[in-house]
Every structure is written in C-alpha cells, then in structure tokens.
UniProtKB/Swiss-Prot annotation:
Part of the 50S ribosomal subunit; part of the 5S rRNA/L5/L18/L25 subcomplex. Contacts the 5S and 23S rRNAs. One of its GO terms (cellular component) is cytosolic large ribosomal subunit. It comes from Leptospira borgpetersenii serovar Hardjo-bovis (strain JB197). GO terms for biological process: translation. It holds the Pfam family Ribosomal_L18p. This is one of the proteins that bind and probably mediate the attachment of the 5S RNA into the large ribosomal subunit, where it forms part of the central protuberance. This is Large ribosomal subunit protein uL18. The keyword Iron-sulfur does not apply.
Length: 122
C-alpha cells in the first residue's frame, strides 16, 4: 500500500519533471492549474520574462458558477472560460497546459474544455 508521503513526493516529482520540459520548450506561456481544498485557481505565466500575464480564481467576488460549490467540475469549466477571456485581453492565444502533476481527468479536463471553448489553443 502506498503511504501518503510517497504519493505526495511522486506528485511533486511528476510536476517538476513536466514543468522542466515545458520551460525548456519555452515558446509559449504556461497555463498553470491548481486546486486547493476550497478553491480552484489558474494563471498564465510567461517564463521568459518571469511575469504572470493573467490570473483567475474561484475565490474572487465576481466569480459566479452554475452550482453552489466553487471547486466542482462546473466551476472548473467557468474558470477555464474566465482565464481564456483574460488571456485574450492580454493578447495570449496559444498556451501550454501545466497540470502540476495531476492527471488529465475531472476538474482539469473540464477546465481545459472551458478554456478551449473560449478560444485558447493548447
């Protein structure tokens, strides 16, 4: 049985490995997705200049999702649309998705689907 420490260390290593590969290619900004116990957040980061181009989270007062929860699949899809709109205002159309070591399923898949529907390409 895998204990919690080994599982979290494996996740961190996966995230660092994939983040290194994304930074190495470096032609497009990264779309970073993160989930906490209460909220979801994302940001578009330009690694060459070292700046955050756009940021969105479900803890914002202006955020409104279809459901009551701010961390479910519906909220993730709305968050994807919101970050795509903010990115397009800054002139960002193509990004690379940084999943932070998480598998592409559930909230991350819904987030990516919402961002693609709103015009981001990755």
């Amino acid at each position: 049985m895998i204990d919690k420490l080994k599982k979290s260390v494996s996740k961190i290593r996966r995230a660092e490995r994939s983040r290194f590969k994304l930074k190495k290619s470096g032609s497009r900004p990264r779309l970073v997705f993160n989930k906490s116990n209460k909220y979801l957040s994302c940001q578009i980061v330009d690694d060459i200049q070292g700046v955050t181009l756009a940021y969105a989270t479900t803890s914002e007062k202006t955020f409104s999702s279809e459901g009551k929860s701010k961390k479910d699949v519906g909220a993730a899809k709305v968050l994807g649309k919101l970050i795509a709109e903010r990115g397009s205002q800054k002139g960002v159309k193509q990004v690379m998705l940084d999943r932070s070591g998480m598998i592409f399923h559930g909230r991350i898949a819904a987030f990516a689907e919402g961002a693609r529907e709103a015009g981001l390409e990755f």
